[in-house]
Amino acid sequence: ICNRLEELGMLSISNYNKMKPRTKKVYSLTKEQKIISNKIKSDWIKNNKPALLAGISGSGKTLIYIDLISSFISNNKSVIVLVPEIALIMDLYKILDDHFPGKVISWHSKMKISDKKFGLIKIKNNKSTIIVSTRSGLFAPLSNLGLIVVDEEQETSYKEDSKSPYYNSRDVALMRSKFNQSNLILVSSSPSLESYYNSKKNRFNYYTLNNRYMNFEVPKILILNMKNKENYRKGSSLISAKLIDEINLVLSAKKQILLLHNRFGDYTKKLYKILLKLFPKSNIARYDSESVKKYGYFKILNDFHEKKIDILLGTQMIAKGIDFKNVLLVGVINADLGMSLPDFRAEEKLFQLAYQFIGRAGRHSNGSKAIVQTFNPDSEYIKSIQKYNIDKFYDYLL
């Protein structure tokens, strides 16, 4: 009705944003980050090749691409930032909105139609916009597209393989950047083997961060051979005696624990019940597809951020790019799950999952630990994990 009245000249429609303008948050890069950020910018001027940014978890890769985004926004360019899961949008949206107030839009399949319409209005009215999205945001009708960021680029969630059209968002991002003559940066602490290979062949410019932000220590990794009976404690067939002891120490220090069990369904429920018996005074929660469906992504993660949860047990969802500030211990219950699957990528995926998950610990403090339970401690993947040697492992796979 309003649109019709406007056509008749009886009223005028305008958009009004009631939100008060906020002050832009000031951030600072370390010397290592500044060097890499400046190198990426200068290399783009020279050859405009896609950039692959790697480095240990917690090294500040996000701050580097925020610095890159800033240079594009200041030149009235728009930016797309892709994340693999809806659950990751909330944290990244807050970070980007602090740095670029009023310019950030979230976009995903669970949004209300009204929110999407409001987002499209902002896209239309603003010359420079930042979209934080899952893979669907890659098709947003942005003008002046200057940069595409694919965070956690190794994630299989970027692949649409359940319905037509089938595509990999990373590859679509590569093509859109070519069509729009924009820049592309792929970001991951454990890149996909394809991207690593492309960097080896000089198709991508490769950059890596070797130190954690603020020089926090990486977690000390302890590998437990679960073939040894002495690693077990009576009443616990899945959790080693060492892991139980370490959990108790961390709980007494009022810190939090993440546990990874990459198995869906009853196995996770069984482990959850074991944890309840072992640590009856602790608040324990699950983070898997069933619990997310019941409580929602944001409810579980927000409760953990607010320290309402002491131990969070999850499937592979728990390993993906979330910045937990109070986690001092992570435990991989069975690092071998998935190794025997008929998939030539099985070992690569296990390495990436464990590498990402271990990086959730000690992001804002020293003294963190990671305990990896395995029946194959001599496998190349386990030995590479213990030494944080990603290049050696990828060269072994290639």
Regions found by a protein language model. Give the residues of each.
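Short, well-structured alpha-helical segments
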Residues: 2-3, 37, 196
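Interdomain "pre-motor" coupling segment immediately N-terminal to P-loop NTPase/helicase cores
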Residues: 1-20
